């Protein structure tokens, strides 16, 4: 794929044959961002495990992602007051289910109480396609809706690898100071290693790179990153 002049100019800042420490990688990646808006710094790490469907979970970033998360909560009665008090953007039961069934999905995360899942489950073709279906394992099917909303607003993100075994995650805005970005990245590594399947063999994280929304990818010394993060 032919890259533009801006990309090629910034690519000269990064030696693609080298693997950098996390501190240097963050510094370099930020320096190659050429968006007019405040771009996101993203990580990509390849996991070494065959049963990819078993690798998934949530990560609570200490400094959030910098993105305003719009949270929808399906619940009834007093739970609606709890969700609203916690800062949920959209709260309801059958009325919201009907709205989503009509194709409306202007939200970034979805929470539901267990008693709502029979009806919410019918929204699978809509919510599932966008990765918005509430799941017990992700903490989004729960009776404690306030806790779920607070965590999502604070920067809890869900992770799962793509078909190639690569986990892609946004870990903050380019405008974040380096220390906050590095702490977010180390939290990602700590969580992935903590959740590593017990039968995983060899090096679990095979590769690790950082890149801005529009900019150059920087390869990280994954062994050093893991050893200094856990």
Swiss-Prot record:
Q: What does this protein do?
A: Binds directly to 23S rRNA. The L1 stalk is quite mobile in the ribosome, and is involved in E site tRNA release. Protein L1 is also a translational repressor protein, it controls the translation of the L11 operon by binding to its mRNA.
Q: Which Gene3D superfamilies match?
A: 3.30.190.20, 3.40.50.790
Q: Can you cite a GO biological process for this protein? A: translation
Q: What is this protein called?
A: Large ribosomal subunit protein uL1
| HAMAP family linked | Ribosomal_uL1_B
**What keywords tag this UniProt record?**
Repressor, Ribonucleoprotein, Ribosomal protein, RNA-binding, rRNA-binding, Translation regulation, tRNA-binding
Q: Would the keyword Ribosomal protein be found if you checked this record's keyword annotation? A: yes
Task: Give the multimer and partner information.
Answer: Part of the 50S ribosomal subunit.
- Quote one Gene Ontology molecular function term: structural constituent of ribosome
Q: What are its GO cellular component terms?
A: large ribosomal subunit
